[in-house]
Amino acid sequence: MPAIPLEHGLAVAGILFCLGLVGLMVRRNILFVLMSLEIMMNAAALAFIVAGARWGQPDGQVMFILVISLAAAEASIGLAILLQLYRRFHTLDIDAASEMRG
């Protein structure tokens, strides 16, 4: 089975990263911000996998495992913060929560 060309894989990773960055800057809902961060991390992981496959090195797979474990830790901590924020302020809007004191 032929491998995906390096340029195509990196282009997809770049597009995914840009989509995640736009979602991070545009959306005000914390849940969507966390999802955008996950998309950006997966784009970086895809770039590692494609680059590692191009040169036949296992380093890309090792970095992928590290990125996935970091993403899991980020998701668990982020969701815990999200739940506490919703319980305290009854909103998931970043701007509304940052203006409230308590």
Curated annotation (Swiss-Prot):
Task: Write the signal peptide boundaries.
Answer: none
UniProt GO MF annotations: NADH:ubiquinone reductase (non-electrogenic) activity; quinone binding
Per its record, the protein catalyses: a quinone + NADH + 5 H(+)(in) = a quinol + NAD(+) + 4 H(+)(out)
| Gene3D superfamilies in alphabetical order | 1.10.287.3510
- Tell me a GO cellular component: NADH dehydrogenase complex
Q: Where are the transmembrane segments?
A: 6-26, 30-50, 62-82
Q: Name where it mostly resides.
A: membrane
Say which enzyme class the record assigns: translocase
Q: Which cysteines are joined by disulfide bonds?
A: none
What keywords are assigned to this protein? Cell inner membrane, Cell membrane, Membrane, NAD, Quinone, Translocase, Transmembrane, Transmembrane helix, Transport, Ubiquinone
* UniProt-annotated location(s): Cell inner membrane
For the biological process aspect of GO, one term held by this record is: ATP synthesis coupled electron transport
Q: How does it sit in the membrane?
A: Multi-pass membrane protein
Q: What is its EC number?
A: 7.1.1.-
Q: How does it assemble?
A: NDH-1 is composed of 13 different subunits. Subunits NuoA, H, J, K, L, M, N constitute the membrane sector of the complex.
Q: Which family does it belong to?
A: Belongs to the complex I subunit 4L family.
State the protein's purpose. NDH-1 shuttles electrons from NADH, via FMN and iron-sulfur (Fe-S) centers, to quinones in the respiratory chain. The immediate electron acceptor for the enzyme in this species is believed to be ubiquinone. Couples the redox reaction to proton translocation (for every two electrons transferred, four hydrogen ions are translocated across the cytoplasmic membrane), and thus conserves the redox energy in a proton gradient.
Write the protein's name: NADH-quinone oxidoreductase subunit K
